[in-house]
Amino acid sequence: MAGKSDPEEKIIKAALRLAAKQGWTGLALADIAKSARVSLPALSKHFFSKTRILAAYGRRIDAEVLQAAADETLSGEAARDRLFDVLMLRFDALAPAKAALKRIAADLRRDPLAAAPLARPMLQSMSWMLEAAGIDSSGIGGALRVRGLALVWAAAFRVWLDDGEDQSKTMAELDKRLRQGEEFLNGISRFNARRRSTFQKDAAQA
């Protein structure tokens, strides 16, 4: 994350610190400003909602994971293995805020309207995770991969919230979900290949 003088970082850290203690639903922006030792008008220059604070935190996690992945040697691995490694790096990056994230996740499950605006930032994060693993996230195929990975991540994240330090359950869930996702995408690819072949044959006979 950025340096100590970064007001956004102070606000994000304050929000997570308070969320770990008192949950997310009842947490006011004024409380966050007070904990961050910034005025409410100063906070408003950076964030106009708690959702925006979480989205900014997510972007910082994205950047941290992208840097960590760049420092790793992933190019020789299979695509699924690269994705596994990248997502585990993401869990490592999230670990310091695990207590806060557990409270936030529990509150957002009970408040779908509050959770809804986070869907788009999450898809963007998953797009970056694919790119970090050397997998294209553009076009129709990329959009399918992004949405599929979001489902994989959501399932593994739920397990991670209650997992121990060894993260064995998280790794098992992540591996299982990635294999399922790979099989699904391979099935789509085979189906599309058959459609193209049939179309080409019909066109040749016309």
What are these regions (language model features)?
Residues 4, 10, 18-56, 60:
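Helix-turn-helix
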Residues 14-18, 93:
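Short amphipathic alpha-helical elements of helix-turn-helix/winged-helix folds
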Residues 59-66, 73:
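Short, basic, alpha-helical segments at the C-terminal edge of helix-turn-helix-like DNA-binding modules
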Residues 102-104, 117, 138:
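Short, hydrophobic secondary-structure boundary micro-motifs
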